[in-house]
Structures are given as C-alpha cells and as structure tokens.
Amino acid sequence: MVTVEEYRKAQRAEGPATVMAIGTATPTNCVDQSTYPDYYFRITNSEHKTDLKEKFKRMCEKSMIKKRYMHLTEEILKENPSMCEYMAPSLDARQDIVVVEVPKLGKEAAQKAIKEWGQPKSKITHLVFCTTSGVDMPGCDYQLTKLLGLRPSVKRLMMYQQGCFAGGTVLRLAKDLAENNKGARVLVVCSEITAVTFRGPNDTHLDSLVGQALFGDGAGAIIIGSDPIPGVERPLFELVSAAQTLLPDSHGAIDGHLREVGLTFHLLKDVPGLISKNIEKSLEEAFKPLGISDWNSLFWIAHPGGPAILDQVEIKLGLKPEKLKATRNVLSDYGNMSSACVLFILDEMRKASAKEGLGTTGEGLEWGVLFGFGPGLTVETVVLHSVAT
C-alpha cells in the first residue's frame, strides 16, 4: 500500500513553474491619446466645462500614452447615455457589455497562447481567470471554458475585483498549481474592459479623471507548467519565487467600489511616493536568498500604473533608463490595462530580446523581477529566471 507521503511526493513536479507561451489581444477600436480629450468631453456632453477639459488635456499629455484600445465606441456610448454621465445609475448597461466581452477578449488572447504552446487544449488541466471588469455567475472562467471547448473537468479559479496588482497574483497562484500538480498545464487569462469605469468628468472627483486618461482594454494569456517536454514545449521564463505584501500606512491609497453607477475609482496623490518608498524592501526580501543586490543587473517588468510611479521608482532605485523600456513601451502603446499589463510586458520583452539577439528572453540577463501594484496598497513581487534564446 502507498503511504500518504509517497503519494504526495508523486504529485509534485520536479522543476520550477515555467512560462511556456504568451498571447495578447485588444479590441479593434484604437483611441489616439492626443485627440481623446476633445472626443471624451464631446461624447459626455461636457464641452462647457472648459477649465476641466484643460486639466484633462494636461493629464493626457503627461500620461506618456500614445494610444489605447477600447471596446466602447461612440456608437455604443450613444446607445447607453447613462454611462456618459458622471453618476447616473448604469450598472445594468455596463454588466450587459462586460459579461459578454470580457470572456470574448480573453478567448482571443488564450487562442494565441495555445497556438504558440503547440499542444492540444485537452492537455490544459487548470484555468485561472482574472478580471476587475464586472462580476457574474457562473463566471468568466465558465464562459471561457465553453468558448474554448476545454474539458469539463478543467480545474477553474475565478478572481474578481483584484485590480492592478493581479497580474502578479495569477502568476503566484499558477506557480503553486504547476509545481504541486505533476503534469499540470495552467492557462492563465487576465481580461479587462473599461466599460465598468468609463464615466463623464466632474470637478470634485479628479482621481476619476486620472483613470479616464490612463485606462485601456486588453487581455493577456499565458500557459504555465513545470518540467517542459524537451523538443515539444519551449520554456520562456521560470517562476522562481512569488510574494505579496501590504504596504504600511497605505490604507485608502487606491480604492474601487462597485455601485449602481459602475466601478468608481479613488486614488490618493501619494501613491507613487508610497510605492517608491517601499519597493526596495520587497526587492531585498526577494533577492537576498539569491545574493543579488544590484537592481540594474535585473530585467524589469513593472505594472505601469502611470508615469509618475515609474519615474519615482527609477529615481529611488537608481535604475538606468533602459531598465523600464519594455514597461514604458506597453504603457505608451496600450495604456494601463490593469491586471493584463504585466503579461503584455512579458510578451514585449521576450519578443524584443529575440529580435535584438540578446541571448536570453530577459534582455540578455539571467534574473528579473515582475512587480504588480494595486488596491490595498498591495504589492506582488515575482522573481523570474530567463531562458537562453
């Protein structure tokens, strides 16, 4: 008879969790940041608020964003005028959009990841789906299982209302699933659509206006498993460790509340300061076991909450400008897509590294860090090990 200990040992994988494929997707509707203030104030019937419009223009100019993708078109917004007001009851209209579009966008990203992975989708054993865009039962995990035609026995986990740190959270969870279930192949999907947060401007809620200048739509998907099959599965990054922490004195720094008016967004001015003040402690705890203390020796994947956060982190840690290149490129081309951002940055980094012949998936470097920041204020820290290209 097999003992519990022997059975448990047989369940565990031998090697570390490994990213084996990445896919991304956006809606087709592309928004030019330079013309967005005019469009936004026109579609929300707010053109008379000239001073506020000037403030919004400055926010968009400072955002370092060139373009974003949004499911919400002018046509959709005209059909749902309550979404264009500042605080009109509109949750039903928003929910009707996101319960369909969030899994649909997730499917696009997942199909790309599965295609790159090159294995039959029947080999997917676990599904982790994450979104801050609406809630429903059965959830997006169920909808995606149906849309992709995954096995009914796939083990699902649905994460709602996590916010911008969740790209790190899903990697942490997928790491544990892959390493503790021999042969597991975990499909991770983060899909975000701003239909829940879009609303008209108001003088008394400027942090909401910041969100209107930064947020975009996108979905990222990755396949994670341990012990890749040689010659069949191609590793991209290894997940070495993962940690989550709440920053001290940060209560109320980033909040979101689901109301009749949709998801309201609240942001304190000191968020960049709170993150930059505490980030080195997270780095030290993560990299001390590896004997690494030179932050410029790492490749960087940081959630691009906004340019102020990136600037302050760069200054605080003395990072060379090129360290946050991949992060800034994604912010510029897509905006802040909440949980999906870090998956886009992983994709950007491995593609740029291969194109430039840098030797590893991590810009030619061996070790890297992935950071997620969000409500709480919560920080996710994932230590990555690159793979030779």
UniProtKB/Swiss-Prot annotation:
Pathway it acts in?
Secondary metabolite biosynthesis; flavonoid biosynthesis
Q: Which gene encodes it?
A: CHSA
UniProt tissue specificity: Major expressed member of the gene family in various floral tissues and in seedlings treated with UV light. It is relatively low expressed in tissue culture material.
Q: What is its EC number?
A: 2.3.1.74
Positions in coiled-coil regions: none
Question: Some GO term, biological process aspect, for this entry: which one?
Answer: polyketide biosynthetic process
Kindly state which keywords UniProt assigns to this record, in alphabetical order: Acyltransferase, Flavonoid biosynthesis, Transferase
User: Of which family is this protein a member?
Assistant: Belongs to the thiolase-like superfamily. Chalcone/stilbene synthases family.
**Purpose:** The primary product of this enzyme is 4,2',4',6'-tetrahydroxychalcone (also termed naringenin-chalcone or chalcone) which can under specific conditions spontaneously isomerize into naringenin.
Q: Which InterPro entries match?
A: Chalcone/stilbene_synt_C, Chalcone/stilbene_synt_N, Chalcone/stilbene_synthase_AS, Polyketide_synthase_type-III, Thiolase-like
According to UniProt, the reaction catalysed is: (E)-4-coumaroyl-CoA + 3 malonyl-CoA + 3 H(+) = 2',4,4',6'-tetrahydroxychalcone + 3 CO2 + 4 CoA
Task: Tell me which residues this entry annotates as catalytic.
Answer: C164
What this protein is called in its record is Chalcone synthase A
Q: Please list the GO terms describing molecular function.
A: naringenin-chalcone synthase activity
